[in-house]
């Protein structure tokens, strides 16, 4: 599994039907690597982390994801917000605690999915997780 990276098709598949908290996105990446939910895979952790950070940046740049904490949107550029995640991200599957880290105070933000023009009046719909 060394140097495995998501293919464009896997990225497209993951990005197609996103919703739910960020641990879902982490789980989709884990699944793409063929790793079972309770399996620890230190060899691929850094690559999965890079893929996760890449995907949240991509989704933010596309306007499909905003990050928020305590009911307030995070401020700063996409790069600054991704860097905030990079700095606080766990160093291993063990520290990730089966995806529970995304619900701990140490996690800098949660997902707010943006559905463009989905409200009755044509405004964007925000799904807070």
Q: PLM ranges: what are they?
A:
Residues 1-50, 54, 69:
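Short amphipathic alpha-helical interface segments
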Residues 16-20, 34, 61, 87-94:
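Generic surface-pattern signal
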Residues 24-35, 47-48, 52, 65-67, ...:
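Generic detector of bulky aromatic hydrophobic side chains
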Residues 58:
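Alpha-helical DNA-recognition elements
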Residues 61-71:
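A short, conserved structural fragment
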Residues 74-129:
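Short, amphipathic alpha-helical interaction segments positioned at domain boundaries
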């Amino acid at each position: 599994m060394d140097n495995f990276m998501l293919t464009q098709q896997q990225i497209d598949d993951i990005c197609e039907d996103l919703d739910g908290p960020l641990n879902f996105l982490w789980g989709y990446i884990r699944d793409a690597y063929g790793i079972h939910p309770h399996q620890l895979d230190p060899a691929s952790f850094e690559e999965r982390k890079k893929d996760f950070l890449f995907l949240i940046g991509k989704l933010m740049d596309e306007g499909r994801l905003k990050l928020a904490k305590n009911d307030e949107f995070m401020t700063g550029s996409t790069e600054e917000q991704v860097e905030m995640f990079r700095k606080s991200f766990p160093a291993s599957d063990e520290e990730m605690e089966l995806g529970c880290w995304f619900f701990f105070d140490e996690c800098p933000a949660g997902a707010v999915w943006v559905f463009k023009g989905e409200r009755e009046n044509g405004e964007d719909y925000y799904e807070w997780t």
